[in-house]
Amino acid sequence: MAKVRGMREKCGIFGVSSEDAVRKTYYGLIALQHRGQEGAGISVWNGRIRTIKGHGLVSEVFDENSLNLASNIAIGHVRYSTSGSLSEVQPLEVRCCGYELAIAHNGTLTNFIPLRRLYEGMGIKFHSSVDTEVIGISFLNHYSQVKDEFEAMRRVFEEVKGAYSILILFDGKIIAARDPVGFRPLVFGEGDGYYFASEDSALRMFGLETRDVLPGEVFVIDGESYESKVLAREKHAYCVFEYIYFARPDSTLNGINVYCARYRMGVELARESPAEGDVVIAVPDSGRTAALGFAHESGIPYMEGLIKNRYIGRTFIMPSGRGLKVKLKLSPVREVVNGKRVVLVDDSIVRGTTMTRIVKMLRDAGAREVHVRIASPPIRYPCYMGIDIPTRHELIAAWRSIEDIRKEIGADSLAYLSIEGLKRAVGTKNLCMACLTGEYPEWAFNF
């Protein structure tokens, strides 16, 4: 099945030390399903590591028998990629230096290739092509020398560069860590046990007290007790696209609620680039919250002008024509847009092909004018820290002016949120915006 490559989150992770750990991990992964729909896995400890994983949605990979595995400790993972063999679905089991672990990783390493060559030169054999394996080997290599989880992770922080929030199942313990910059989110929860998740929305169902794992912080969960230490400090740079697109709206990351940040993006956009319109509509679902903010600030009524078909899933056999794909996923409400000046709000434009189809769809439904407003700045650069953004050549804003993009998509007007407006909306300057500015955090490339 052909896949149109767009901008996607790499994955989500979940871990728990508590009774009925496997079933709780299953529920947690379902809550993180938006972060990856192409593969899932759970690793447990009951005297040894056992891993169940497969391609597909969480509900497709696990059955009742697998959920009945007896264990009070488990980690899990959801991934987006359709490429690679089952051996590359996480958690990965890694064996090195006389030890073994299972590891789940959200992010991307920037020095994966030189590190892999280093360890291969030491005679260590790799069993996958994913960068996650390097983290596991780095940890086991250093642990074999120091016999201490914290010191081993301190050395990992010095050696491994890039974006990584990780959960490691090792010797009956869970080790959780977030890279010193804090690119990718990770949350700790405490209640009837100890929990970790990429987003706090995946922990809320368990009634826990939660907090962010700090950048450079490491947890070691050992039965009914835990210890945590901040082992490395760098200038924080939280991925801005977690707030723009990837995280669930009901999540709070780094003390900032995602829904409120997206709503403020719409407010800032309306202030910076007002439009004369009769109705504000969103590209569902990602543009909805910003569209509500835009409508409130502009005084233009918000209505649902595009309806999303929620039953086109991962296994749907897509037609070859791009236009038909968009029409299968989205349908205009003619009565909402016919004869109207429509303000269309979305979170971002990657290539521009989908937006072109949507604008035409609205015109075919009778829209008199279509004014496109994008609740983020233009994406001009690729991401090397865990978001699958296409190459720069494929990014329409990398090589075309905003006016050229407007003509390409067929809109009457086009405006993006500014960098400063985005910072105001999110409410922190500690953001990685490399895909928007081309300014990559120094630590991730200092090797």
From Swiss-Prot:
Keyword field contains Iron-sulfur: yes
Amino acids binding [4Fe-4S] cluster: C239, C383, C432, C435
Annotated GO biological process: 'de novo' IMP biosynthetic process; purine nucleobase biosynthetic process
UniProt remark on cofactor binding: Binds 1 Mg(2+) ion per subunit. Binds 1 [4Fe-4S] cluster per subunit.
Reaction it catalyzes: 5-phospho-beta-D-ribosylamine + L-glutamate + diphosphate = 5-phospho-alpha-D-ribose 1-diphosphate + L-glutamine + H2O
Gene3D superfamilies, per the entry: 3.40.50.2020, Glutamine Phosphoribosylpyrophosphate, subunit 1, domain 1
Pathway given in the UniProt record: Purine metabolism; IMP biosynthesis via de novo pathway; N(1)-(5-phospho-D-ribosyl)glycinamide from 5-phospho-alpha-D-ribose 1-diphosphate: step 1/2
Domain Glutamine amidotransferase type-2 residue range list: 11-224
HAMAP family cross-referenced by the UniProt entry: PurF
Identification of the protein by name: Amidophosphoribosyltransferase
Species per Swiss-Prot/TrEMBL record: Pyrococcus abyssi (strain GE5 / Orsay)
